Amino acid sequence: MARMRHFLKRCPAVLLSAALLAAAAGTAAAADTPAPTLGIYTTGDMGGRLYREDPVTGEAVEYSYQNVASAMEAERASVDAALLLDSGDAVDNGLVQDGGAAEALALRAIGYDALVPAVGEFRLGPEARDDFFAALGEASEDGAPVRVLSGNYLDEDTQSPEEDAYEVFTVELGRRAVRIGVLGLGAMEAPEELPESFVSGVRFAHRDNTSGSYSWEWTGYWQERLG
């Protein structure tokens, strides 16, 4: 679609450092009726870029959440239903960052359905990270809650997910409800890149995942439980 930008990807299926659970996406339609359309969109590595212009330099910013908002307004008008997902590194880790408060507000206002945290979110530090995740989930007049999904951000001792591992979204297509499952996987490299105090008490792969791979997290753990 010509109007789409590089920062906004439209996918026939979701692979968001994650796995798309089986879902019946087909919708029966009369021969003379166009089939309803579901658009699934992803962004990632936005790094706290909120505006079309850098507030310090005044230079144009090609990849920003303000641009996403405009693009999604057009995309939502062109499809019958839409999911909007972010694969993480959404926040600014610079010297003047605000702990992700502005990014959380932007994600909610734009109408993101879920975020899969990447290393950037964990660079905030434990307290600011938890505040950012909580701010995403707030229900307020500032926008709808955004789900934080991670099936490999785990408690060190219990190996239970610290956030919801997955979500099954239901969208209406024509006269059918279509269920789409999204499992979040990300930030597996966090222990190697961050201070120990930032990842104390948590782990980013199940103990049996000796290869340290995202594919194992799906095939070796989640596929059996969600299949």
Please give the residue ranges for each predicted region.
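Acidic, metal/ion-coordinating pockets
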Residues: 31-227
